[in-house]
């Protein structure tokens, strides 16, 4: 679940597409302080799973159906995106409950 409150703005650094999916590489700062493989990150409100990460970037796979049904298809390198980590249990609840699953 997400609160709908944007934690930071990230930047698309690379998009790799193949027959079954696209892989987004996203530059970020604040959320990178506590990120793990498998974490859920809302990217422009759409829940994506972290598949890899480095010091200042993370990657997420996006299935073609998700691309076809969302504005993620409009992204290109250099695009700015809204980022939010999933709400932690017992964490502060300052927005409203949002599920970003397609």
Residue ranges and their predicted role:
Residues 1-102:
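Conserved loop->alpha-helix
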């Amino acid at each position: 679940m997400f609160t709908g409150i944007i934690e930071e703005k990230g930047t698309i650094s690379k998009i790799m597409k193949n027959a079954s999916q696209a892989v987004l590489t996203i530059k970020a700062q604040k959320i990178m302080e506590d990120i793990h493989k498998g974490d859920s990150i809302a990217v422009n409100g759409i829940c994506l799973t972290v598949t890899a990460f480095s010091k200042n970037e993370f990657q997420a796979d996006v299935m073609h159906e998700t691309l076809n049904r969302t504005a993620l298809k409009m992204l290109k390198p250099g695009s700015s995106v809204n980022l939010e980590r999933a709400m932690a249990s017992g964490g502060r609840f300052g927005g409203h409950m949002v599920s970003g699953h397609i």
